């Protein structure tokens, strides 16, 4: 049986790119997403390519939903060996217009959702003495971004959580790393463009030092490396897949 990889936010964008790449790598893949129909469609497409895949409707901000989703993955695919936490929401609001409710929602999905998924996956990895966790953070957590205090803070929390987890779990054979993208051409980015929250992928893309926006496949390739044996001596690191937009 192939190792089971869980990808949250796997119905579209970065998560879908990661799910496709991990399936191509030979993993069984569970696509978790709040959009249940989208998760099912993504899993069906993976199965059509010969992969063993499952779509599960999960709201990462709801702890009970997360636990139920992981229980289904175990029952239908097996224990979790790889977790990629791509589920997240963007937000663009001036500082003084960020309501408490808006703040709480961003933190609940992006940070607490990541934490809940990790807690649900790690017991299987501890039993196996092996695991890979890749969180998806953001360049905005490293450099800051206008009108994104809530989003940047949530992703900064993901970075701090990643480092703490790496220290906690290293002796158990589990690596934990984060990928911090910059501009990536996804449905979420295009939706923000359509509402006028930022100038647009085609406007910002040429400003990237490498001359283009990133793609989900760019992020997925880095994720695949971190999940493979070739990445086994890397943990606690923040990998900027950003076209040179942020250099540390």
Indicate residue ranges for each PLM-predicted region.
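Active-site loop immediately N-terminal to the catalytic Tyr-X3-Lys motif
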Residues: 93-96, 143-149, 171-172, 211, ...
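Alpha-helical segment proximal to the catalytic Tyr-Lys
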Residues: 123, 167-168, 232
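Residue(s) in the substrate-gating loop at a strand-loop-helix junction
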Residues: 138
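Short C-terminal tail/terminal secondary-structure segment
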Residues: 143, 207, 224, 235-248
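Short, small/polar-rich loop/turn modules that mediate ligand/substrate recognition or access, typified
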Residues: 170, 175, 234-236
């Amino acid at each position: 049986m192939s190792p089971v990889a869980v990808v949250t936010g796997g119905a579209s964008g970065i998560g879908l790119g990661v799910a496709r790449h991990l399936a191509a790598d030979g993993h069984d893949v569970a696509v978790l997403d709040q959009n249940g129909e989208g998760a099912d469609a993504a899993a069906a497409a993976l199965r059509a390519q010969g992969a063993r895949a499952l779509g599960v409707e999960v709201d990462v901000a709801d702890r009970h939903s997360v636990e139920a989703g992981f229980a289904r993955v175990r029952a239908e695919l097996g224990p979790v060996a790889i977790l990629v936490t791509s589920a997240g929401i963007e937000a663009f609001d001036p500082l003084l217009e960020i309501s408490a409710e808006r703040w709480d929602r961003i933190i609940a999905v992006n940070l607490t959702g990541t934490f809940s998924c990790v807690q649900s996956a790690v017991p299987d990895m501890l039993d196996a003495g092996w695991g890979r966790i890749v969180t998806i953070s953001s360049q905005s957590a490293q450099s800051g971004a206008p009108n994104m205090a809530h989003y940047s803070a949530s992703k900064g929390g993901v970075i701090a959580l990643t480092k703490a987890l790496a220290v906690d779990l290293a002796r158990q054979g589990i690596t934990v790393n984060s990928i911090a993208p910059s501009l990536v051409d996804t449905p979420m980015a295009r939706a923000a463009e359509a509402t006028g929250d930022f100038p647009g992928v085609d406007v910002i893309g040429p400003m990237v030092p490498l001359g283009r926006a990133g793609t989900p496949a760019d992020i997925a390739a880095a994720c695949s490396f971190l999940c493979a044996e070739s990445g086994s001596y890397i943990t606690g690191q923040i990998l900027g897949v950003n076209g040179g937009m942020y250099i540390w």
